[in-house]
Amino acid sequence: MVKHQTQKKGVKRKQLKNIPSGVVHVKATFNNTIVSITDPAGNTISWASAGKVGYSGSRKSSAFAATMAAQDAAKNAMNSGLKEVEVCLKGTGAGRESAVRALIASGLVVSVIRDETPVPHNGCRPRKRRRV
């Protein structure tokens, strides 16, 4: 019995072109830094993380890895015509400030820097203290 193979349709990506302004979300944890660039409506233009750039293990948590991730995300977003961004920081990792510096150095105009780090109003019980 002959089985007919159906062609798989390739996933078509949306082409987001000429987006002059956007929002950069920087999530800096103790283990990694994730940089997502969206349009004002929240649709993702580009993203990068320290792991995606090529770092693994404890090197992902370094400030230099966050710089490389921010440069990679900014370069891809500027190909879509992005010029001006608002920066939303979340978390207390090592890559917070270095990611913002890399965005400015890559040629993006930063209009606002917002800190949206979630702070509990005495919510869940924290995990146990580390004993080294």
UniProtKB/Swiss-Prot annotation:
Keyword Ribonucleoprotein: yes
Keyword terms, alphabetized: Ribonucleoprotein, Ribosomal protein, RNA-binding, rRNA-binding
One cellular component term from this protein's GO annotations in UniProt: ribosome
SUPFAM superfamilies registered for this protein in UniProt: Translational machinery components
Top-rank lineage group of the source organism: Bacteria
Record-stated family: Belongs to the universal ribosomal protein uS11 family.
Protein name (database record): Small ribosomal subunit protein uS11
Protein source organism: Chlamydia caviae (strain ATCC VR-813 / DSM 19441 / 03DC25 / GPIC) (Chlamydophila caviae)
Lineage, highest ranks first: Bacteria, Pseudomonadati, Chlamydiota, Chlamydiia, Chlamydiales
